[in-house]
Amino acid sequence: MGTVHARSLEPLPSSGTDFGALGEEAEFVEVEPEAKQEILENKDVVVQHVHFDGLERTKDDIIICEIGEVFKAKNLIEVMRRSHEAREKLLRLGIFRQVDVLIDTCHGEDALPNGLDVTFEVTELRRLTGSYNTMVGNNEGSMVLGLKLPNLLGRAEKVTFQFSYGTKETSYGLSFFKPQPGNFEKNFSVNLYKVTGQFPWSSLRETDRGVSAEYSFPLCKTSHTVKWEGVWRELGCLARTASFAVRKESGHSLKSSLSHAMVIDSRNSSILPRRGALLKVNQELAGYTGGDVSFIKEDFELQLNKPLVLDSVFSTSLWGGMLVPIGDKLSSIADRFYLGGPTSVRGFSMHSIGPQSEGDYLGGEAYWAGGLHLYTPLPFRPGQGGFGELFRTHFFLNAGNLCNLNYGEGPRAHIRKLAECIRWSYGAGIVLRLGNIARLELNYCIPMGVQRGDRICDGVQFGAGIRFL
């Protein structure tokens, strides 16, 4: 009997945070002619054994959970498909540098005429790995250095130390991550961190030292994360010209909060989707588990994408949120919402919409923002089928509002206030997709509905990030 080799044409990932996210991979099959005919003549096959070559410190139980479906295959094509799926699951664990699959006919005294053996040839990651990369955040770039201890206890546990230095934020943290065997989407993590950020639109500097524990799990078609966070916050003035409203916020505070996040995401891409929808809902309750900060905070994000003729895409998005202080204390400038900038309401400067004092923007306790977008190929389609496919022409209309509410007035008064003094803008530009890392926008913006105190960016505006309105 002959041998069937199954291997992917795509290169395997050797590092990175998104292990095993390989997408749809082509399969290359080499079959000896006589063996192929003999195997395919058998309508049904049985996977008798699954072997692993190359395991050193990985425990058997977590491996068994990932390859169980291979034994359920009933024909050769199904064996290859399920073996490929098992390979992707193994790569997603983030403990192997390489996984190859070998499918062979079964040998030995107990071998059945239609029996198959599947062998996974694996190469484990080293006990200590390092990484260096750059990241693009909310209109901010940063350099990231990391050290990682993969597969620490043999069941895909991971300890990571990361240092990040950016234009507005510097952070370092230590985290422990443990997935549930057989269900990678169910995982538990603990984080220790320190973050120092500068917010020039508020003349504010903030240093957070904290610890958090979170549990993530899927439920039907949704993903959920439950989190507890305790953080010691230190607020200070970034400049001597800081307003009195910012100066009186300076000092130390302790926040202990419970939060829940739900995500439904059917988009084909998180950076520049062509189809699908996204719904994110976040709730946070602070004060009931300790600390001197108490509030309830809710916010959501909705996005719909629809492909049109001529390779165009119509996209619409809606954001909103509300923060309600508990007790007699006012909300902190560190907890409020901010709006404006190239990643939200375009045509306005970064976080420069809403309540302000002496030029310092203080944020708001309620906001909404919406956008309509039309993405089309570049005129005359330069670079079609190649580099030119990373670019899109962008037409947009954005609107939103940010304010503080008097919670004794009732819902109708709140809606009326959010509907007053709406800021809006429109324009056009070019979008560049940087793989699955980030996207860049260069737009010509025309801000409208400008209110007193708003800081605008009339004309060309550049934006970089992952999350855009």
Curated annotation (Swiss-Prot):
Assembly with partners or alone: Associates with the mitochondrial contact site and cristae organizing system (MICOS) complex, composed of at least MICOS10/MIC10, CHCHD3/MIC19, CHCHD6/MIC25, APOOL/MIC27, IMMT/MIC60, APOO/MIC23/MIC26 and QIL1/MIC13. This complex was also known under the names MINOS or MitOS complex. The MICOS complex associates with mitochondrial outer membrane proteins SAMM50, MTX1 and MTX2 (together described as components of the mitochondrial outer membrane sorting assembly machinery (SAM) complex) and DNAJC11, mitochondrial inner membrane protein TMEM11 and with HSPA9.
Membrane topology: Multi-pass membrane protein
Domain of life: Eukaryota
TM regions (residue ranges): none
Subcellular location: Mitochondrion outer membrane; Cytoplasm; Mitochondrion
Keyword Transcription regulation: no
Domain notes: Its C-terminal part seems to contain many membrane-spanning sided beta-sheets, that have the potential to adopt a transmembrane beta-barrel type structure.
Gene Ontology biological process terms, A to Z: cristae formation; mitochondrial respiratory chain complex assembly; protein insertion into mitochondrial outer membrane
Organism: Rattus norvegicus (Rat)
Name of the protein in its database record: Sorting and assembly machinery component 50 homolog
POTRA domain sequence ranges: 45-125
Biological role stated in the UniProt entry: Plays a crucial role in the maintenance of the structure of mitochondrial cristae and the proper assembly of the mitochondrial respiratory chain complexes. Required for the assembly of TOMM40 into the TOM complex.
Keywords on record: Cytoplasm, Membrane, Methylation, Mitochondrion, Mitochondrion outer membrane, Transmembrane, Transmembrane beta strand
Gene behind the chain: Samm50
Entries under Gene3D superfamilies matching the protein: membrane protein fhac (3.10.20.310), membrane protein fhac: a member of the omp85/tpsb transporter family (2.40.160.50)
Cellular component aspect of the GO annotation: membrane; mitochondrial outer membrane; mitochondrion; SAM complex
PROSITE patterns in UniProt: POTRA
InterPro entries reported in the protein's UniProt record: Bac_surfAg_D15, D15-like, POTRA
